[in-house]
Structure formats: C-alpha cells, structure tokens
A protein has these predicted regions:
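Intrinsic-disorder/low-complexity loop/linker signature
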Residues: 11-12, 24-25, 82, 151
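Structural signature of tandem-repeat unit edges
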Residues: 21-32, 43-56, 66-79, 89-102, ...
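Low-complexity, acidic Ser/Thr/Pro-rich repeat tracts that form intrinsically disordered stalk/linker regions
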Residues: 1-16, 22
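Short intrinsically disordered, low-complexity coil segments enriched in acidic
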Residues: 1-5, 178, 186
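Membrane-proximal C-terminal cap and juxtamembrane stalk of leucine-rich repeat ectodomains
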Residues: 2, 196-202
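A general structural signal for short secondary-structure junctions and capping/turn motifs
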Residues: 17-18, 202
Length: 202
C-alpha cells in the first residue's frame, strides 16, 4: 500500500509513529511529542487524527499542509506550538481539547478556510498572530479562564463580526483585531479601563 511508517525519538526512548493512507488520512500514535516541522509542506495529507498518548505537537509540525482539512487533537496535549498549522489554507475544522493551556505564536496563521473556533476554558494564553489571516473566521468562542491575547491575534480576520472578551482577561496585545473589516461588536466583560484603542484595532 501507500501507507508509510516513521518513528520519531527524542533520545529518551519516546517514539511517535504514523500511518498515511491513500486517501490522505494521517493517524499519529505513540507517546511523547511530534517533532518540529515533522510534516511541514506535505500536500498529501487531508486529515489528521492524533491518538491519546501524544502529549506535544512541535513547532511548524504541519505548516504548509495546504490540503489538510480537519484535525483532531487528543486530551493530554497541553501546548499547540508556534506555526503548528500555519498556512494550512484548506483547514476548516480543528478540535482543541480541554488539556491545552497555551496556543503559541501564529499557530493557525493564514488558515484562510477556518470558519469557527472554540477556545476551551483550560487555555490561559493565546500568542501573537495565532489567527492572523484567517479570513473566513466568523465565529470565535473565548472561554472564561483566558488571561492573555497577544499582538494581532485576530488580525485580518475579515469575516469576523462579533466577539466576547471574558472577565478573566488581564492582558491584550497591540492591534489584536487589526484590519477586521466587518467587526462591529466587541463585548468585553474584563476590566478594560486601562486599555488603549491601539490594543484592539485600528
């Protein structure tokens, strides 16, 4: 078959294996973390299922997988690293589990087909540019527990019309909603008395 198998190891006998089927479904199993840039630029991949036991996803692991449409991330993963799914322009669906605590810089940058995202209550920090250039994003749910939004986190989200900011938020970066042309309503439950206009949008 066209199935492939590969083992990544961090030198401590922690291995990750994968199978890639003819229809582009990538199934990842084992224990430990997926290596940085492990599948970067692989245009054969159309869907990713990560099994429980995997605890980390390396920086840029799936960046530029332009035919990837859906991703399932298991309970146990705590961080989505920088540029993990950056420039996955066909990605429409991603499930973020309740064990993730941080989403790092540009993790979903330029995922231009992504239409909605739910950030679970476990996430306390969303890095700079995480959803920048997600031009089809219309629905975002930010849960209570989130404390930080980075610079330009939702920059160029041209389809985003409304968003609610939870009371737990204490820090918001510059131009968090820069160039969100259709954004008409920001409902803020946090104490925003010290925030300047540049923190939100231009």
């Amino acid at each position: 078959t066209a199935d492939e198998a590969l083992v990544f190891s961090d030198g401590e006998d922690i291995g990750i294996t994968y199978t890639l089927s003819d229809d582009g479904k990538l199934v990842i199993s084992g224990t430990g973390s997926i290596a940085d840039d492990a599948f970067a630029g692989n245009t054969k991949i159309t869907s990713v299922v990560i099994s429980e036991g995997v605890t980390g996803i390396g920086s840029g692991a799936f960046t530029g997988c332009t035919n990837l449409t859906s991703v399932t991330i298991p309970e146990g993963v705590t961080t989505i690293d920088g540029m993990t799914f950056g420039n996955c322009t066909s990605l429409t669906s991603v499930t973020i589990p309740g064990t993730v605590t941080s989403i790092e810089v540009q993790a979903f940058w330029n995922c231009s087909s992504l239409t909605s995202i739910t950030i679970p209550a476990s996430v306390t920090s969303i890095g700079s540019g995480v959803f920048q250039g997600c031009t089809s994003l219309t629905s975002v749910k930010l849960s209570e527990g989130l404390t930080r939004i980075g610079d330009q986190t939702f920059g160029r989200c041209n389809a985003l019309e409304t968003i609610e900011i939870p009371a737990s938020l204490t820090s918001i970066g510059n131009d968090a909603f820069k160039n969100c042309a259709k954004l008409r309503s920001i409902r803020c439950y946090a104490n925003s008395s010290t925030w300047q206009p540049r923190y939100i949008c231009d």
